[in-house]
Amino acid sequence: MGWEVVLLTIEPAEHSTMFHHPNVLWCREQAREMGLEFVSVKAKGKEEKDELLAMKQALLKMKADGVAAGAIESEYQKERIDRIAHELGLRSFAPIWRASETLLEEQVRYFETYVVAVAAEGLSEGMLTRKFDGQFVKYLKALKPAVSPHLEGGEGETFVANAPFFRKKLKIREWKRKFDGSSGAAEIAGLA
């Protein structure tokens, strides 16, 4: 028996430590290209507890049997998702948890991914909208101190515009960048 997969997106207040923020409104398009049902829920407050409550309520409303997350290195995120799943009696999956470098190499090779937020020393405004490719991974590893190539410690965020399981590529027509001198984000202003 398989699983019916639904893409659940929690729309947090800006600067969430738990959930992705830049370009979250475009997750609907990603779900469409993956052929998945899409559910989006706005967190009613700015604190972590508000975001987790939104997730918990959405999972209950959906009558979910499990929750899968893309956490790779963030104990912070994985522990909280596991806790919500446990409280609701759901199975928790993190299929790429502690994934090898091979998985990152495959993502770089087969996915079209863009850097949409930066917040670490060595990551400048010029990195925004840059393709997340092999050269970028090498750059991150060479920084002193090194930055995780998964960008999971709050160092940055990415947006996937194409993947082997997308029906067609999301063609980004325009970006709007904001940078305050030490961190910034690039929001998609439109798709072609």
Protein language model regions, located:
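ATP-dependent adenylation/nucleotidyltransferase module used to activate substrates
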Residues: 1-117
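ATP/NTP-dependent adenylation/nucleotidyl-transfer catalytic domains that generate, transfer
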Residues: 30-39, 63-68, 80-89, 109-192
